[in-house]
Amino acid sequence: MPELDRKSARVFSGKVVRKDLVRKVKVGANVPVFVLEYLLGKYCATDDAAAIEAGLRVVNTTISSNFARPDEANKAQSMVKDKGKHTLIDKVKVRYLADDDKHWAELVNFGHKYVHIPEHFLREYDRLLMGGIWAQVDIRHQYDEEAKGKRSPFWIDGLKPIQVATFDLEEFRESRRQFSSEEWLDLLLRTIGLEPKNFDRRLKLLFLVRMIPLCEQNYNLVEMGPRGTGKSYAYQELSPYTILLTGPTTVPNLFYNMATGKMGLVGIWDAVAFDEVADLQKMQKEVVTTLKTYCESGTFARGKDALTGRASVAMFGNTNQPVDVMVRSSHLFMPMPEVIREDMAFLDRLHFYIPGWEIPKMRVEYFTDHYGFVVDYLAEALRDLRKHNFTEAIDRHFSLGSHLNARDVKAVRKTVSGLIKLIYPHGEMSRDELAEIVELAVEGRRRVKEQLKKLGSFEYHQTSFSYIDNETREERFVGVPEQGGRDMISSDPLAPGSAYTASVDDQGKVGLYRLEVGCSPGTGKLKIAGGIEGTMKESIQRAFAYLAA
């Protein structure tokens, strides 16, 4: 067994699982990933090939006989009645009804909302009352004709959570100290099913940026890139606390329904992700307007009330052109629907733009066969970390440059905070490790501002983003690779006939130009094309006269 697998299994005993086995079972079973991982951890926690094969057979048998499918609810209820008792894998929710002065359990796929549950389970697993948990349930059929109040024939005799029912953040942080940052990065990547040896350090960090909305409150993320790069995976499979929307939504659904008095998605979920963002073209303008206010402050107004939410927002879209074409001919928000891309104030509230074109399309060889966290355990860790704040961590060693305004600083700080929660949850990192994530955070925010500069001209002209070492006072400027980064003007000698020049207008704005002179057969006469007037036209005529002499 490789060293990292051995260490992971030792330090996080019972909380890691072999990811290749998850894929093998997932293909043939439409059940939540954390249910599969629980069963695999129970029956396949070994290196013995024969034992693993036997364990896989048990897992498949357990799923086929115990997993309750929603379309077979009546069949499952009838089977429990006929057999007298049965073991099911289902999601269990518990609510208190004052009229009955009693707690009732609901088995979601079993299709019954009134199941008797012993009170001691509520004391052991308080999450039963807060959204519910997936569990292995021993259910019994016994009809009591003498019972008072609401009658139900179904009773829970045993309940064993499949999800993490309790989580200790301090234990998680202490365990993190036993890994180097490189080992921890690799373990996180294997948790989402990827083999880290296929990716360089930068790509590993970009994969983790996708997960920042899961651990950072009110974080606004956008990613545009080719299809098939796994943009929305974390919001479908990694956490039960996120929701992925695949089409237009409404203000009542997303924020607050005044008719029913119920909170919308941003008040229920930790992160709300929009997949295929181009499909939002038909979304009402009011949604974007309200979302714009929410993305700035986490608040929104409905009727007379000002309400708050903590959900982060992630937007994913597909590009139909190579990035170099978009950079030259338009801007990187072009794949977004018109209702969003024309609202510069909304775009300015995005904290990070992931360059999805750098991430390769997923291939079979990119998937890992090694140990990673049980996804539900990591989901609990990320959810617990949302309560903590690392936005001031950057001040230990660095300060931000003068071109970053208040929104830019907020965006960079939140990105740094999110990456620290993911990579350094114990809060310990070197100066160089902090510099690495600060530089990435600055780059992601600058990518947003560079597009706004194209859309809004000089209103967003200050994009020379930098950060300063507080000890040496060295200022490091951060570029965006798709526009040439800091090497857009090469240090190599220019070809003959080419030159760079700069000019300052009457408002003090600086413009940088590249002049290229070509040579082709002509008539010997000067013809000035375009709308050139005044001083520039006279300069050209004077230069031509000089050459003609």
Name each model-derived stretch.
Residues 191-195, 280, 294-298, 319, ...:
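Conserved, well-folded catalytic cores of nucleic-acid-processing
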Residues 171-205, 529-537:
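Dynamic helix-loop-helix/coil hinge segments at AAA+ ATPase domain boundaries and subdomain interfaces
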Residues 327-361:
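A short helix-turn-beta junction within AAA+ P-loop NTPase domains corresponding to the substrate/partner-engaging
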Residues 351-479:
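Conserved NTP phosphate-binding and transfer environment spanning the P-loop NTPase/kinase superfamily
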Residues 1-191:
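Extended, charged/polar low-complexity intrinsically disordered regions
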Residues 180, 184, 283, 287, ...:
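Helical mechanochemical/support elements of P-loop NTPase systems and associated helical scaffolds
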Residues 480-549:
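Conserved P-loop NTPase/AAA+ ATPase motor core
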Residues 195-325, 330-334, 348, 468-483:
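Conserved ASCE/P-loop NTPase catalytic core
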